[in-house]
Amino acid sequence: MATLGAWDYTILAVVLIISVAIGIYYRFVGGKQSTTTEYLLADRSMNVAPVAFSLMASFMSAVTILGVSMENYQYGTMFVVINLSYVLSTPVAAYLIIPVFYRLKTASVYEYLELRFGYATRLAASLSFSLQMVLYMGIVVYAPALALEAVTGLSQVFSIVIVGVVCTFYATLGGMKAVLITDIYQSLLMFAAVFSVIICAWVKAGSLEVIWRVAQENGRINLTNFSVDPTERHTWFTQILGGCATYLAIYGVNQTQVQRLMAVKSLSAARAALWWCLPILCLLSLSTCFSGLCIYWYYRDCDPLLEGRVNSRDQVMPLFVVDTMGEYTGLAGLFVSGIFCASLSTISSIISSLAAVTLEDYLKPLVSCCAKRTLTDRQTLWYSKLLSLFFGALCIGMAFMAGSIGGLLQAALSIFGIIGGPLLGLFTLGMYVTKANEKGAIGGLLISLAFCFWIGFGQPKPPLVSLDMSTAGCPVDRSFARDIFLKTVIAVAEEEHYFYLYRISYMWYAALGFLITFFGGWLLSWLFALLKWDNNRRIYQDADCTLIKHDLFVPPIAKRLQRRQMPLLVVTGTSSEIGGITTESATAPPRLDEIEWEKHKAVA
């Protein structure tokens, strides 16, 4: 077992110390984290750059570096096509979804669902998100522990605890500002880790052309799978359609990302952060994909898993570091630091978002209902910090359970698809369909979640079959390799006997969840309204149900509703119900002012 040198440990220690120092710094400067808004939303004063980097780092973490590289090593480059879905989905998130949330100015994205449908819908969605993040955090902490075990021999227990403690410390102490600033330099170290692999392979191969040619000769360069079969793991359709649904579930309606977008100064800044995140995200994705080809070039004649040197594909990248970077002082430490940072940035984001959701969606309503009072800002801040500590401890516990999960990349994207897809459908239903009601929305969500969990976790599933791996250049006996190969061949031959829904590609989970929630909720809403079991009165501003709260819908629909309601505007009193609180106003609704009405009459 190889070990890190003194310079490697020095680099790793400096990286951890900087993260802790940033947390301490933001605890004692500026507002000193003395208000809930500053602690959870950075006082809504952040610039575009840190938010853009944080949007990327929050989810494209150690799972990306270890998982995507092995995806290309083992299955080829078809996964690269998913970057097109990022390009297609960014304008949808920036110009349709985010404006709706930005108007709310709230710490929890799920408050929208209470305004649109009711508290029961908000609670159901918030609980689903919490489950999603708790499952995901285990994978994220487990990944760097796996890397350190392969590179240094340090136990997974020690590595998991170090990552969890450091991350929890600076996130709890420094709040959102510390999280966003650390994400910048942690993102740069993530890139450094990936490019250290590429450059090392480049030096040893002599040119990038050699690496590309070897990958091409061995079937790794594959961008022509246009199959419409949903059971094929990666095709153009799975990557673009499934990728769009996954991207929007993460960057459009996920609390962790929207909370970052709420930390900037204006809606235009939030849109700019999303657009700047796009090239950063694609650059990391593409470079990580190519790093997988670099690693394949090095092990093309002796696959480490078939040789028995590692226990899973996710350990191959750290093994490459052991085999190639030891001669370069500090380079292995740089790689391990990048893996650490990839995990730290994600966990800190998850801790912050779970604290915000628990406070806003569970604790505050509970206190209001049971104690008949509201929390002061000082109490809210104190509870936020306690919740951050709790979720930091929870992420350490979940990491110990992640070792039983298979491939990191597929596990992570499956979780986002199974839960994120239905949540995307729920928000889309609320923002696009004025006739949707609460019972229909909850019914669609529950049906979709049940279906996605069924196909996502139902067993037995056919094992994943990789492209050909060679052991011709290995110096030891190949009996172990032959056993694995024979088991794989048998599994492929019997794949058609598996239940069809269990064979569906994991990339379709988000799209299927979205469609079932959206159309199922739409149909159920129509049925419940027909039977007079529910209505959609919450979307109206007045008691007569004539003026719709257009801000609850995406901008194109909101503008259409505005124009339609212009003749209904009066200067007399109107009733406005927001979040269950009814208020009386002596003027027209504030979002439909008299100036717009005068312009409308002039045009007419």
UniProtKB/Swiss-Prot annotation:
The chain crosses the membrane at residues 4-24, 48-68, 78-98, 134-154, 160-180, 188-208, 234-254, 273-293, 331-351, 389-409, 413-433, 440-460, 511-531. Pfam families: SSF. GO terms for molecular function: symporter activity. It is a multi-pass membrane protein. Keywords: Cell membrane, Glycoprotein, Ion transport, Membrane, Sodium, Sodium transport, Symport, Transmembrane, Transmembrane helix, Transport. InterPro entries: Na/Glc_symporter_sf, Na/solute_symporter, Sodium:Solute_Symporter_SSF. Disulfide bonds: none annotated. PROSITE patterns: NA_SOLUT_SYMP_3. It comes from the Eukaryota. Glycans are attached at N222, N225. GO terms for biological process: sodium ion transport. It is found in: Cell membrane. One of its GO terms (cellular component) is plasma membrane. Belongs to the sodium:solute symporter (SSF) (TC 2.A.21) family. This is Putative sodium-dependent multivitamin transporter. It comes from Drosophila melanogaster (Fruit fly).
